[in-house]
Amino acid sequence: MKICVVCSYGIDSPGGVWNHVFNLTQQLKNKKIQHILVTPESETNTYDRTNHYQIGKTFKINSAGSKANITLSPFINKQVKSIISNYKPDIIHLHEPFAGSLPISFLLNSQSKNIATFHSNQGTNLYKFGLNKIFKPLDKKIHVRIAVSKTAENFINTYFQHVYEIIPNGVNTEFFNKAKKIDKIKDNKLNIIFIGRNDHRKGLNTLIKTLKKYTFDFPVRLIILGNKISNLNINNIKIINPGYVNESIKAEYLQSSDILCAPSLKKESFGIILLEAMAANTAIIASDIQGYNEIITNNVNGLLIEPNNINQLAQSIKKLHDDKNQKQKLITNGNSYIKNLNWDNISDKIINVYKNNLNNKEIADH
């Protein structure tokens, strides 16, 4: 079985899609399944290039309030044909199959079984402008469709009505659980961590406004992993903002944090960072939005608050500081929640889709 994994986003686009693709390909490697990875070009050199092809210069586009690097190059068709001809994949697995010219070129040229995973909860305005009709012929070339959540399924099913199998994102439970703590920040301060791009919809500004408005009767430290933010001062709060960090350092910061704050303003397709926090034994405060509330049950494995409600956010921070038993209950329940969501299990589900699709001689669901 030969797999060609196609990721629409460049590997310098941090976020859920690349996290998913990276972990999937690592599992394919661990399980000795022959595969290659194809992405748009990137300046990042941290990924193993052995079986990694980069095609097409990237452009930063706005998508549902976030930014992503995709290729729109019309000159990649020859390279795509060459990869398909030389590698002869049994399966082409496309992540966000209509996002840019790379996955579209693979669909146009594919003679393989095509599997598509849909990650987005809103997508670009292309569909809303009716361009989804242009993609109808390409859509017919997809044999099996996966969505990472019910939210992602509901979005894409608005434009392409099919049966979607839901296979959620996974988490490296052992990796985050066994990450070492950072001694210099394990003191008497309450460590609150935010992880993600500084896009408006991610809600970092809500957290900052909360910490500026409320004075807590205990010391607080804010850790921001993501964009570097210049001239950020919040009362007497110590701020750590190293920018984007690798997975190992992220795991260490999560292990050293008391609370992960995920104050997104709009619905998310999933929320991998919530699973990572659970694996790292970190309590969670998250917005009560689609995607997040598929993972978090309020007062069970996290606290859910109204989006952009700084009063609720402040109260939740104080609650988790003051009530250690409640905090530990959330952490324990979080550990139970992710028990079956480790990447070993999730990748097995995806591999089973590969095998079943190869054994199915008919094109499914058209």
Residue ranges, per PLM feature:
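Acidic anion/phosphate-binding donor-loop and adjacent secondary structure
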Residues: L126, N154-N157, G170-N188, L232
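Conserved donor-binding/catalytic core segment of Leloir-type glycosyltransferases
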Residues: C4, K184-K202, I208-K212
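Carbohydrate-associated surface elements
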Residues: E41, T151, G170
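Conserved acidic donor-binding segment of nucleotide-sugar-dependent glycosyltransferases
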Residues: N298-N299, L303-I310, K319-K324, K339
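N-terminal strand-loop element at the rim of the active site
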Residues: C7-P14, V21, Q27-L72
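Short hydrophobic beta-strand element within catalytic cores of glycosyltransferases
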Residues: A283-A286
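Short alpha-helical donor nucleotide-sugar binding micro-motif in glycosyltransferases
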Residues: Y244, E252-S257
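Membrane-proximal helix-turn-helix segments that form the acceptor-binding/catalytic region
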Residues: N125-R145, T151, Y159
